[in-house]
């Protein structure tokens, strides 16, 4: 874990466009800080993650199939070129580019450690939660377009 993340709800209130982007930021920063509360705040209970063709359906499947493996690593995830399309009052789409660095847990600062640097594209559908007012990821497709380094750093 790097540094503690900011709280789930930020002040002052964000515009819808910023709040939509913040849902993605909450999701990826939660990996980097191993913040389960932040991660849970970013997704709906019935969210779907399609990671390079592997489908995980429901928050629990995403948590156990993705989050627990990545959160124990030394990582940084960066999102850029974000485009937000608000399709309805409580629905939106986002596309963006992602860059992520991965080291085995505790090895990020060790010179010569194996790593994987990956670039990819995200296509995300989001909804605004009527209960807490937060925008959340409903369907998240991640396609890795290139990788540099050792994929074995993901070894379980």
From Swiss-Prot:
It comes from the Eukaryota. InterPro entries: NTF2-like_dom_sf, SnoaL-like. Pathway: Secondary metabolite biosynthesis. Part of the tra gene cluster that produces terrestric acid. The clavatol biosynthesis cluster cla and the terrestric acid cluster tra are both involved in the production of peniphenones and penilactones. The non-reducing PKS claF is responsible for the formation of clavatol from successive condensations of 3 malonyl-CoA units, presumably with a simple acetyl-CoA starter unit, and 2 methylation steps. The esterase claE probably collaborates with claF by catalyzing the hydrolysis of ACP-bound acyl intermediates to free the ACP from stalled intermediates. This is Terrestric acid biosynthesis cluster protein E. It comes from Penicillium crustosum. Disruption phenotype: Does not result in significant changes in sencondary metabolites production.
């Amino acid at each position: 874990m790097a540094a503690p993340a900011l709280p789930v709800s930020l002040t002052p209130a964000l515009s819808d466009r910023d709040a939509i982007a913040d849902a993605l930021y909450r999701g990826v920063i939660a990996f980097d800080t191993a913040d389960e509360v932040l991660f849970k705040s970013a997704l709906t209970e019935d969210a779907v993650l399609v990671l390079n063709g592997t489908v995980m359906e429901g928050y629990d499947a995403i948590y156990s199939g993705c989050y627990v493996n990545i959160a124990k690593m030394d990582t940084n995830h960066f999102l850029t070129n974000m485009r937000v399309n608000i399709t309805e009052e409580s629905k939106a789409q986002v596309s963006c580019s992602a860059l992520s660095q991965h080291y085995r847990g505790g090895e990020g600062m060790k010179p010569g450690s194996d790593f994987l640097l990956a670039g990819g594209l995200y296509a995300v559908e989001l909804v605004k939660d009527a209960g807490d007012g937060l925008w959340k990821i409903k369907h998240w497709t991640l396609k890795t377009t290139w990788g540099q380094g050792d994929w074995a750093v993901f070894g379980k």
